[in-house]
């Protein structure tokens, strides 16, 4: 962020006003004062512990702020899962961060309730950053009722030496999607697995199609393993997880409990990691 020249786009589901956010906020304000375009997009429900004055302070410093689904509207939604859980940072269209980390002290292992926090977050450079930049602009335009032009936030990607680099594809999905892109890709990967399917997730609540695909894979000789945390951050969801785990064990899958603390990332692997 400190090296940003044109823009910093920040999008999180949860932002807590603690020392982690305060360090980030300081950098964002400094860059805004330097003339860098800084935008912060937050989910209303996930950031409900933040106050209006916290966002107003950023606006006074020249930072653009937008709220995804204001809470009063979100509470009226029939589907409570219509929230924006994305965690994306895009810097100058050249560097992107995406993964499981929100902003708060628990995500760096400083919360007494959870202790050590197991998560995965990626730093991406190269052409794949374009997909993150586009995703942010689309979400921003929806939440802020603006019309940012994609062309203004995309950069010509330098030609990298492909030796030693793995291909990366960013896939997004949500209520605004006409197809269930992430779900359908998971389903395809499970059906096409020949060796193993390893899943590490805090919540294992698959729908019928994913559950059946995993059972079929396990019964067909594919090594299916599922790892869940020993500590829940949502108890009701956690106990529902155990119900599905029981079905998978009965189908021959191997299931493990991560004893150190909570696993937050959802990370299935087939032959190569997918997250």
Regions found by a protein language model. Give the residues of each.
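Charged, low-complexity intrinsically disordered terminal segments
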Residues: 1-270, 275
């Amino acid at each position: 962020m400190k090296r940003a020249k044109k823009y910093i786009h920040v999008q999180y589901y949860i932002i807590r006003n603690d020392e982690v956010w305060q360090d980030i906020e300081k950098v964002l304000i400094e860059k805004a004062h330097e003339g860098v375009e800084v935008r912060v997009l937050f989910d209303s429900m996930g950031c409900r512990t933040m106050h209006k004055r916290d966002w107003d302070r950023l606006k006074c410093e020249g930072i653009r702020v937008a709220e995804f689904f204001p809470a009063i509207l979100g509470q009226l939604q029939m589907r409570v899962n219509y929230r924006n859980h994305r965690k994306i940072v895009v810097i100058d269209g050249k560097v992107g961060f995406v993964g499981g980390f929100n902003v708060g002290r628990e995500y760096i292992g400083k919360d007494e309730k959870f202790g050590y926090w197991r998560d995965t977050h990626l730093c991406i450079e190269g052409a794949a950053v374009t997909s993150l930049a586009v995703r942010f602009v689309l979400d921003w335009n929806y939440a802020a009722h603006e019309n940012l032009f994609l062309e203004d936030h995309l950069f010509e990607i330098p030609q990298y030496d492909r030796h030693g680099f793995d291909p990366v594809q960013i896939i997004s999905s949500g209520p605004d999607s006409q197809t269930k892109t992430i779900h359908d890709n998971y389903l395809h990967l499970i059906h096409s697995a020949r060796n193993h399917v390893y899943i590490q997730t805090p919540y294992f609540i698959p729908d019928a199609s994913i559950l059946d695909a995993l059972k079929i894979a396990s019964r067909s000789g594919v090594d299916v393993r599922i790892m869940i945390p020993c500590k829940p951050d949502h108890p009701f969801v956690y106990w529902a997880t155990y119900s599905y785990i029981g079905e998978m064990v009965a189908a021959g899958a191997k299931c493990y409990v991560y004893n150190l603390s909570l696993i937050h990332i959802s990370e299935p692997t087939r032959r190569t990691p997918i997250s």
